Amino acid sequence: MNYRKVYVKENGKIPKDWEIHHIDFNHNNNNIDNLISLPKIVHVVIHQTGYLNRSEINKLIKTYNKNVKTN
């Protein structure tokens, strides 16, 4: 099953301008525990910087959300 369909089946609609990220970077691993929705800009940063685990991704999301709220 397509990873986006897997995500939507479990979590509902993907927000506009958000992407689904494979946490382990393995696009064949479509287990729901390996999928996370992210704003597109955060997704780009993850792939450019090589953030590899959920903890680092969560820190990045918190920083993004904090910056969005203050701007």
Predicted regions and their residues:
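Short, cationic Gly/His-enriched loop motifs
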Residues: M1-T63
